[in-house]
Amino acid sequence: MFYKEKYIPMRKIVFFSVFMLVCTIAFAQQALWGGAPVVSPEIHDNNTVTFRLKAPKAVQVQVTGDFLPTQKIKTPFGEFDGPGVADLKEGKEGVWEFTTPEPLKPELYSYSFIVDGLKIMDPSNVYMIRDVASVTNVFIIGGGRADLYKVNDVPHGTVSRIWYNSPTLGMNRRMTVYTPAGYETSGKRYPVFYLLHGMGGDEEAWIALGRTSQILDNLIAQGKAEPMIVVMTNGNASQEAAPGETHYGMVPPSMNLPKTMEG
């Protein structure tokens, strides 16, 4: 049996290829951008804040954060003040919502959601900070000292992650160093401020959670701080560097590190 080859004009092939490409892009955008965006957190003009989460199948949704009144938390080491918790109310299309009853004072705040007992991040807020093994979303209410935490239109310093050899500990280690604007070309000598984190922290703690570079940039620009070098070390003598930055790979962060008090 013989088969006759059918000729398909090139313009039809090109048209079909373009059509399929457009359909693919359209479906991809629909998957990425499908539905109305959920705005969260929404900071209102009076500094009240609305938190939203789309969870149509959830039974209970709560928000927990340091902007809420504290609650007592029992631990093996006794009772401590922990972040408060507030309930969200379900609205249209399965979007849950909570608005703070009072305006929030200027500050950097952290929070997360609890959905049916499971703690999750706010998918509408890409800004997050790790504190030891905890990850939370963050937002800033501007004004007062909180403006120091922002990136403002001022000269900016440089943040470097530097590896050095420690003969005492027998390993290479990592530190974070802030140098003020103009440091590289000034030819001047600068005072050095050594900044150590708290228990469980590392060389990333102050620069991320503590907003060191933003605060120094702003204070120096305002003439309220002398230009200086800030060295942020890793005080855990058993660590080369922060979790995920060592040759051990992406190990889980821990508070109970060996040699913690020898750093």
Task: Give the location of each predicted region.
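Intrinsic disorder/low-complexity segments
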Residues: K6, V18-F19, F27
